[in-house]
Amino acid sequence: MYLCHFSSTTLLKKLSGNRRSMAPSLHTLSLLFFFFFFFCFLRLSTAWRPLPRMKNNVTELEFGGYKKYEGSSEFVKLKYHMGPVLTSNITVHIIWYGAWPSAQKRIIREFINSISAAADHRSPSVSGWWKTVQLYTDQTGSNITRSVRLGQEKNDRLLSHGKTLTRLSIQSVIKSAVTAKTKPLPIHPKGGVYLLLTADDVYVEDFCKKCMCAYPFSVPDYIPGLKPLKSPNGEAAIDGMISVIAHEIAEVASNPLANAWYAGEDPSFPVEIADLCEGIYGTGGGGSYTGQMLNDEDGATYNMHGIRRRFLVQWVWNHVVNYCTGPNALD
């Protein structure tokens, strides 16, 4: 993945819902997080998803005594570096770049709305997943906010910056959205997150290189004998995107200025709370195994419920217990 900080966090990623997910000409989607809007420095890091085993799920008994240590390692040194976390309400504004079908938009909207949904809806839940993120505090002891809501949206159907976006032109797309003469997106200096999502015919610079895109809903041909999982909402690209959106909202909340919660000594290359659990979706996950997930009667794989839909979202690092946790944990 490629990341750019604007006195905060900016992220560009793309996902593919097709089996040959490394080919940028196929159906792809990108997202960009932009938090605040001032100066910028660029950094490059590689996102990865672990290669899977041939079995997607195993029984609880097979986990033995290791099921409570998903992702744990004596080498993980997540530290708090005294910077702020997002304790104010988070508002996610979306820029739809290109022609987006309404059905796909609805899936993404519901996921964002599910983060702060009432706790009494079906478990395991998206809001239950966010509780792990809320464990992180600033130096005053204030926790990350419970409130994450969908803000305003802007459609850029005419592709104002062309069908090919670079990291620099992506910055221009967001700047245009917040400075537009008609219906500009509002600027929230304490909790505004700007999410740029590109349609399937838009190419983004360096998309999906040196990584496995949209796994486990898409599997490259070089892994023989493994079929992609059925996505919970019938949209492999969008369902794969949901986990990346969740990943980055969790990290922008816990490390917005690259000086709060992360592992490693270099703040320009931080390993953040979702990076530590990349590819882990359930109990027993770690290494090359995704963990125990849920399968519905229609064959779809998921690990948490939203307001009305189901989603497959990676776990995040829990600094209290020092391993990855999620709402669908068997223990």
Each PLM stretch: what is its role?
Residues 29-33, 197-208:
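Short, intrinsically disordered, charge-balanced linker/junction segments flanking boundaries
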Residues 49-174:
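N-terminal carbohydrate-binding/catalytic regions of secreted carbohydrate-active enzymes
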Residues 81-86, 176-190, 231-234:
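Surface-exposed acidic, glycine-flexible loop patches that form ligand/cofactor-binding
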